[in-house]
Amino acid sequence: MKVVETVARLEAFRRARAPVAGVEMGLVMTMGALHEGHRSLIARARRENTVLVVSIFVNPTQFGSSEDLSRYPRPLEADLELCRHEGVDLVFAPPESELYPLGSGTKVVPDPALTEVMCGLSRPGHFSGVATVVAKVMNLVQPVRAYFGQKDAQQVAVIKSVCCDLNIGGRIVVCPTVHDPDGLALSSRNVYLSSAQRSTALALPRALDKAAHLWAGGERQASELERAVRSVLASEPGLEIEYVAAVDPERLAPRQDNAGPVLVAAAVRVGSTRLIDNVVLGQHHERRPIIAIDGPAGAGKSTLARRLAQRLGFLYIDTGAMYRAVTWRAMQERIDPLDGERLSALTRAVRIRLAPGYQSAFPTRVWVDGEEVTRAVRDEAVSLHVSAVSSHPGVRSELVAQQRRIGEAGGVILDGRDIGTHVFSRAELKIYLTASVEERALRRADDLKAKGLPVPDIEVLKEQIRSRDNQDMSRAYAPLRKADDAIEVNTDTFTVQDTLDRLLALYRDKVGGSV
């Protein structure tokens, strides 16, 4: 992971990657003091981009005169360690003079309709400061995607508007708010709360839950939703209400005829700590399909799954890389591939991160406990042991749980041995790819050669493939088999493009999706 403090070094990093085909850069902007909410943003950005930049900058222009800039926490070393562990490629942590070399000078002034309501009432100038720094960093990084949290709903609306009005490229991806188990939204400011104050602050999520309950019961009047939230908050001694609003999520204005979704948001103070949270009600997201591709090793699953994901705009989850990551770690710790108990414990403890690659020989980047092991997990020794390691129920159950968490929202493609039969048995489209042993051996030889690795005799490769097939099909837990509702596609005599065209046709016919 690189850490840079200057604009010149950041631009050099970006320019070095710009000419590389397939590079998609993601950006997560933060003010540091990173917590699990930030981690969730970074983790999603890591999955969806080939290169990930995180900025850490306590932006002085978004602090008001009554807000203590010097008091804001700055645990930089801990923040860098979290970024390193999550597989971040570059952290941009500039001093104030680097982003504001001539002082605060030029400013971006967003639409007052978005900034003179809600948080803007008590924080004049705040959103101009936010818009200015976002415009600066977005222009410097030029990301394909930039990730922001739903907790800062007004900030998200402002950023979307500014990026649209100023033609700043990159898609704004809004990620769900992360809450602690007690219900309080994660915030860097939570550290200021005493135990008693935290208990008081829990009235905020309770109040929003009340609004959600009323909505579920048919209430659509914004005034009634606001009244219910205020009632819960007002009943909590020691809590000061700053505002409660029920507005259009994009325009932050009253809804017309009570139609469409509503953003119910509130800001409160507990002691000297200001807290915000919100909930969007009535926003329907139609889940995109899940596509499961199963089959034996060497049938072309990974290549086709990646290309299909690119064509459809889906997220590709490289399940094989996850099992290889566990196998690599087990080999590092000299764990016997037959020791299911130790392997299961290892899988629960190890932290795996995946990202799209930008080299044809290594199309998935892999991190294990913060260390990039993209090449190491493709080593022949790992290939020989991965089937044995993945056969243990404890290993599979943990990785399957992770895969389900990533894919449950839909719009994903997974390939493996048991995706359609076990991981996502209700996937909307299931494909079973197969090919002869002879064809798969030839493909394996070509793959090894492309990676600059030793190529065994073709008969040795055939025997290895037969052995792997036998292991996969005879394991006790979730063995390789064709799902009853899967469509079998033999790839022996077809090019990758021919097979891809057939899969796209199946997607149109079976799911009704557009390509």
UniProtKB/Swiss-Prot annotation:
Subcellular location per the Swiss-Prot or TrEMBL entry: Cytoplasm
Gene3D superfamilies reported for this sequence: HUPs, P-loop containing nucleotide triphosphate hydrolases, Pantoate-beta-alanine ligase, C-terminal domain
Keyword Nucleotide-binding on entry: yes
Keyword terms of this UniProt record: ATP-binding, Cytoplasm, Kinase, Ligase, Multifunctional enzyme, Nucleotide-binding, Pantothenate biosynthesis, Transferase
Family annotation (InterPro entries): Cytidylate_kin, Cytidylate_kinase_dom, P-loop_NTPase, Pantoate_ligase, Pantoate_ligase/cytidylate_kin, Pantoate_ligase_C, Rossmann-like_a/b/a_fold
EC number: 6.3.2.1, 2.7.4.25
Region (Pantoate--beta-alanine ligase): 1-279
GO terms for biological process, alphabetical: nucleobase-containing small molecule interconversion; pantothenate biosynthetic process; pyrimidine nucleotide metabolic process
Catalysis: reaction(s): (R)-pantoate + beta-alanine + ATP = (R)-pantothenate + AMP + diphosphate + H(+); CMP + ATP = CDP + ADP; dCMP + ATP = dCDP + ADP
Record's keyword annotation contains Iron: no
Active site positions: 38
Organism superkingdom: Bacteria
Coiled coil feature spans: none
List of residues binding (R)-pantoate: 62, 155
Pathway(s) where this gene product acts: Cofactor biosynthesis; (R)-pantothenate biosynthesis; (R)-pantothenate from (R)-pantoate and beta-alanine: step 1/1
GO molecular function: (d)CMP kinase activity; ATP binding; CMP kinase activity; dCMP kinase activity; pantoate-beta-alanine ligase activity
UniProt family annotation: In the N-terminal section; belongs to the pantothenate synthetase family.
Biological role stated in the UniProt entry: Catalyzes the condensation of pantoate with beta-alanine in an ATP-dependent reaction via a pantoyl-adenylate intermediate. Catalyzes the transfer of a phosphate group from ATP to either CMP or dCMP to form CDP or dCDP and ADP, respectively.
Name of this chain's protein: Bifunctional pantoate ligase/cytidylate kinase
Naturally occurring in which organism (per UniProt): Gloeobacter violaceus (strain ATCC 29082 / PCC 7421)
Taxonomic lineage of the native organism: Bacteria, Bacillati, Cyanobacteriota, Cyanophyceae, Gloeobacterales
Gene this protein is translated from: panC/cmk
